[in-house]
Structures are given as structure tokens and as C-alpha cells.
Amino acid sequence: MASMRDIKRRKESIQSTGQITKAMKLVSTVKLQKAKSKAENAKPYFDHMYDTVLNMLRKSGNISHPYLSAGKSNKKAIIVITSNRGLAGGYNSNILKLVMSSDINKEDAVVYAVGRKGKEALARRGYHIAKDYSEVMNAPIYKDAIEIGKAVLDAFVADEVGEIYLAYTSFKNTVSHEPTLIKLLPVDMEAALQEGEKSEDLNERLTLMNYEPAAEEALNLIIPKYINSLIYGALVQALASENGARMQAMDSATNNAEDMISDLSLKYNRARQSSITQELTEIIAGANAIN
């Protein structure tokens, strides 16, 4: 059995750790609310961009445009959004598992890493890291999405990559986050039109939309903005998911610390009781020996 001194030291150590995890939980909660607010405020703009692209595709018929067909290259650009820090449960490992289990072969992947954890993990596994945007996840803004979007679009137009994908963690609510992989380019026209048919109010929302110049030229302007909006939406959702995951992890760690402290307190009291009993037994035995 551990001595009372050992138990006391371990209890104090766990109490100190519990205070840290509790503080980290509170910080993550505040950051989560800020990121969640960002995502909610930006959603109307992103929805409008999606509706605009969908409407253009519906009205254009069999339009031919580079953004609607795969490039000549077999390489596939993939924007992978993870965090710069750990202590977030399975947040980073889940998105990495999604990327590595996807149909994108390691040999064909050209990774645009957003987040240090993802960059380091994929580099160790032999993935080609084209660009590193880890600093973005400290406080993502729309300008960051424009920079990332321009980099992948330039590679697509130059036929350095034939397809562009985006891997991030979709924020559902405080406790639910879903690793997600979507194709950005080429735009899947058939899937987009099918999605449009499911939308009951789409026609009502888009009746006043007309395009000047022609649809082909308009796509040159709209698609980059559409891609940027998807990337920014993914950044803020990923940030909210990261802090939600960290909040849950720290809450679980704090609860575990409290359980361990309770268990150690019980062990300490038992050890103390045993020590007192032993001392009393020795005193009584000594008194009997004198008598």
C-alpha cells in the first residue's frame, strides 16, 4: 500500500492538473462561441453564393467551361484543415483518417496544409506538402480563404492538378462535429442540378437573377468567389469544431481528475485510519507489557 505521503503528493499533483484542464475548458468555451458566431454571420453570404452558382448552371444548359471539367493532370489538390495544437480529443486524428482512407492516392495528392498537426502527420507519412498555411488557424479571416483559394485555382488553371478537394471538420453543434471531404473543382454539374431539384424554394429565391456578361464569363468571376466562400466557411467551422472538441476533452479530463481525487481521498483516509489503529495497538501492547 502506498504511504500517506505518496498519496498526498499524487492528490496535489492531480488537483493542479484538474485546475489547468478546467481553465482550458473555459477558454475553449469562449473561443467556441466566437467561432460559432462567425460561422452563423457568414452563412447567408455563402448560401447566396451557392444559389448563384446553381442558378447559373441551371440556366446555362450544356455550358463548356474549364471549371466544369477535370484537368489533364492526375494530381489532386487537397486542402486539409486541422489544428495547430493538440489536447482536442480525436479532432485531428479523425480528419487525417478521412484523408488517408479516401480515394485520393498518396502519390497523386498535393496537400495544402492548414494547421500544423495535419501538416506534420501527413509529411511523416510521405504526402507532398505544396504549401503550409498553419498560421491561418490562429485566427482565420476571409483574406486567408482568398489566398488559399487563389493558390489552388492557379494550380488547377495551370494543369498542375486536375481536381481540388477540401477536407475539414463540419460543425453541427457543440458536441457533434463531422469530418468532411468535398470536391471543389471541377464543379459537379449533374450533382448540383439534382441538388437544385430538391430545393423547394430555390426558384422563388432566384427568379430575379440575370447575368451580364454571358454565363461563361460570369463563371470566371463567380466560381473563384464561390470557392473562397467554401474555404472560409470550412475554416470557421473547423475552428468551432476544434474548440468544441477541446472543450469536451478538457471537461472529460476535469471530471476524471475529480474522480481520481475522490478515490485518493478515500485511500488517504483509510491509510490514516490504519496508521492510527496501528499506533493505538502499539500503545495498548506497551501498556500491557508494563503491567
UniProtKB/Swiss-Prot annotation:
It is a peripheral membrane protein. Keywords: ATP synthesis, Cell membrane, CF(1), Hydrogen ion transport, Ion transport, Membrane, Transport. GO terms for molecular function: ATP binding; proton-transporting ATP synthase activity, rotational mechanism. The keyword Cell membrane applies. The keyword Membrane applies. It is found in: Cell membrane. GO terms for biological process: proton motive force-driven plasma membrane ATP synthesis. GO terms for cellular component: plasma membrane; proton-transporting ATP synthase complex. It comes from the Bacteria. It holds the Pfam family ATP-synt. Belongs to the ATPase gamma chain family. PANTHER family: ATP SYNTHASE GAMMA CHAIN (PTHR11693), ATP SYNTHASE SUBUNIT GAMMA, MITOCHONDRIAL (PTHR11693:SF22). F-type ATPases have 2 components, CF(1) - the catalytic core - and CF(0) - the membrane proton channel. CF(1) has five subunits: alpha(3), beta(3), gamma(1), delta(1), epsilon(1). CF(0) has three main subunits: a, b and c. Produces ATP from ADP in the presence of a proton gradient across the membrane. The gamma chain is believed to be important in regulating ATPase activity and the flow of protons through the CF(0) complex. This is ATP synthase gamma chain. The gene is atpG.
